[in-house]
Amino acid sequence: MINVLAVASEVYPFVKTGGLADVVGALPAALAAHDVAMRVMMPGYPAVKAALGAAPAVHHYAELFGGPATILAGRAAGLDLLVVDAPHLFDRPGNPYLGPDGKEWPDNWRRFAALSLAAADVGRGAVPSFVPEVVHAHDWQAALAAAYLRFTYGERARSVVTIHNLAFQGSFPVTIFAGLGLPPEALAIEGIEYYGGIGFLKGGLHYADAITTVSPTYAEEICTPGSGMGLDGL
């Protein structure tokens, strides 16, 4: 049996804006038949915390990208969950990425860097009751976990980044780099730098131990200049 932590910004049936949520929600049951014990990490949106109910905190942060936070462990809808409870980042109206005005939250970089860092911390043994051998990050919102893990000195989980939709890459101004907590050498073409800015997905793909996508056909397509969205060379 291998322990795997799946990390995603949305998971069915709690929060869904697209197919990503369906895939991540179905993976644990599908992989259990292959001797994989999977827990799912996701942000502590109001709907997630309501479904989880009273759940113990298994890790505490005095400060996580702007405020205190905890990792909650529990079970809901047949899924074993680790939830990043950071109200300053995730207790908001709207969908996971947009406010009620339909615009992206200006601190989305901070919100999903926090999710990624929490996943990496679990991959470094922060939750003794569940130490994964693999951290499986889905799309740009979780991809930076691979970068945080790569800059770990000591025991760590291996990282897998899965691309569901290459059109969404998590691109931000270079000015956010200092707030990510990564070492200076990460700000490079052979790192998370992307056309003068920061690319969460690009950085995750660069630092991941393995990369997968949703089908063999899509894997071939995104390796071509026409469909690679600027990342085909990577």
Each model region followed by its residue ranges:
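Catalytic cores of nucleotide-sugar-dependent glycosyltransferases that transfer UDP/GDP/TDP-activated
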Residues: 1-234
